[in-house]
């Protein structure tokens, strides 16, 4: 998984079309690219390109179904398979298999930027936690080959994943090491129960 913005995104995808699977779009709350504001629109999105071999691990996190979507389909009861007006049972199972209130994730992710950033391209830890949970399980290893200030490492540690980070700049490596060491892993209330 790699972050990018056009025209880099296109070059990234074309560098290995065979392994490119799909992309997410991260919608930020604050615009960027102000130095070019007189010549092009400000950017509030960044692409997240997913690459992998034959099949990429994917553990979708349920998203809430909007009220407007819920209002279009009336639940009429009906046992193990939903019985909805205006939608077949098969269609319901494919689109809303998490239950009446949740559906599959959409490819646009909305997360604000970090308030106290240490690096010019720093990503928000909650966004990275979302992506890590979407593609890995506890105890697996997360690699960030452009670690920067270590936000991916912080997210990985919080989620009980192993982490390998690579950073060329000594200043940012020190910042990342400190942040990751200070991060607290999440605690499960029932992890010791039989």
Task: Give the label of every model feature segment.
Residues 1-165, 171-175:
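Core catalytic lobe of class I
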Residues 165-166, 193:
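Charge-rich, low-complexity terminal tails
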Residues 180-194:
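S-adenosyl-L-methionine
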